């Protein structure tokens, strides 16, 4: 039997877990202010007069204000010079103030009024009026819904609307030490949950049961539960993001579990693949090829190297092991990795079309999955962050198919 897989009851596995949140340090108000200052520097270098930061991750990142987007327009203006200005429905203004970390004026609109007109009026009031001859450039955060962009566009003949991604992505891709510490804690928590989940596997258990256990295990280590969870058995493991129907575990099935949690808004996302029982020669070959490809991608991830080269290194490794080429199956049907932070998938991406040079503070998943349709799939997903000395793993990669969690002594 694979080491660490099976042998415990759900109750025993949960009781062995404990809260891991001691000493967590949230992002400070000073750091939010620093982020705003950095964004303003980037705006000035790009000739952008102001950016609209829509409710959601970007608003939280720059202001600390947690507000989920809806059909009602909520967000903040950040001018290239000066203080931020919020926009919100009149009836939400006090709630918004309660959630503020960076406090500022709130411009309000009643339900029968146009928030898009308020958008234009607020810009004019803070010294950015529309000009037809030389329209100021106004960036809209890339997560702003189209219906809001369209509503604004109908009223902004004297403004040039542009994508604010050069500002938002530039600031968010390179994490601070405090961000990396929060991500490290989230990943440490999820690794312990992975070990616990592996220990409860038994013939006849369903993917639904394991999913429920993982949610409770994440709570036990101090998270609010799983941020997401994919549990797959047998042939279903060849589907990167799963199948519709639950599966029941059988002896010698491949198991794939991909899950994560949030700590102060920062996300973990870790996948483990192993066999419930004794690996056969085919399973062992694919698993070893996956581990080799993951290691090749990590080795290629050096400062200044374009993201695409990391993806290419994984694909070259897989071809050498008899898989692919490119996106062909059996092989790797998707990119090698993605950036991660407050969003589970964010820039930059380890994919053939991304020329972004790797830089200190960037954080990535490394998951060059091998899919063998009709048989099984293997995905080993760990994350790394770039330092002045090169890449550093957040979590130790799986040791072997026989001892995926490195438990043997």
Language model features with spans:
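Active-site neighborhoods and metal-handling regions in enzymes and metal-associated proteins
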Residues: 1-409
């Amino acid at each position: 039997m694979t080491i660490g897989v099976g042998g415990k009851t759900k109750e025993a596995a949960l009781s062995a877990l404990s809260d891991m949140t001691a000493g967590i340090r949230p992002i400070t108000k000073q750091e939010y202010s620093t982020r705003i200052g950095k964004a303003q520097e980037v705006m000035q270098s790009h000739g952008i007069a102001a950016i609209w930061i829509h409710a959601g991750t970007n608003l939280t990142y720059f202001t600390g204000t947690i507000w989920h987007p809806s059909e009602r327009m909520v967000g903040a203006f950040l001018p290239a010079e000066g203080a931020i200005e919020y926009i919100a429905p009149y009836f939400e203004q006090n709630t918004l103030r309660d959630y503020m970390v960076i406090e500022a004026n709130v411009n309000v609109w009643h339900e029968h009024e146009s928030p898009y007109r308020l958008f234009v009026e607020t810009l004019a009031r803070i010294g950015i009026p529309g000009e037809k001859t030389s329209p100021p450039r106004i960036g809209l955060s890339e997560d702003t819904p189209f219906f809001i962009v369209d509503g604004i566009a109908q009223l902004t003949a004297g403004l040039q609307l542009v994508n604010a991604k050069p500002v938002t992505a530039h600031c968010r891709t390179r994490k601070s030490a405090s961000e990396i510490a929060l991500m490290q804690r989230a990943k440490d928590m999820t690794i312990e949950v992975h070990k616990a989940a592996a220990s409860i596997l038994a013939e006849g258990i369903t993917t639904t049961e394991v999913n429920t256990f993982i949610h409770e295990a994440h709570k036990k280590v101090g998270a609010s539960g799983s941020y997401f969870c994919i549990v797959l058995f047998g042939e279903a493991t060849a589907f990167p993001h799963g199948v519709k129907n639950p599966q029941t575990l059988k002896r010698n099935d491949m198991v794939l579990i991909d899950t994560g949690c949030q700590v102060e808004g920062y996300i973990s996302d870790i996948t483990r693949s192993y066999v419930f029982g004794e690996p056969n020669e085919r399973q062992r070959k694919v698993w070893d090829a996956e581990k080799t490809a993951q290691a090749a991608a990590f080795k290629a991830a050096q400062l200044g190297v374009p993201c695409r080269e990391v993806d290419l290194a994984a694909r070259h490794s897989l071809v050498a092991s008899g898989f692919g080429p490119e996106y062909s199956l059996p092989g790797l049907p998707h990119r090698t990795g993605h950036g991660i932070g407050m969003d589970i998938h964010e820039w930059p991406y380890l994919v053939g079309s991304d020329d972004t040079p790797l830089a200190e503070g960037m954080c990535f998943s490394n998951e060059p999955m091998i899919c063998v349709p009709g048989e099984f799939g293997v995905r080993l997903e760990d994350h790394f962050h770039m330092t002045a000395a090169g890449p550093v793993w957040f979590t130790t990669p799986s040791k072997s198919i026989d001892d995926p969690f490195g438990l043997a002594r």
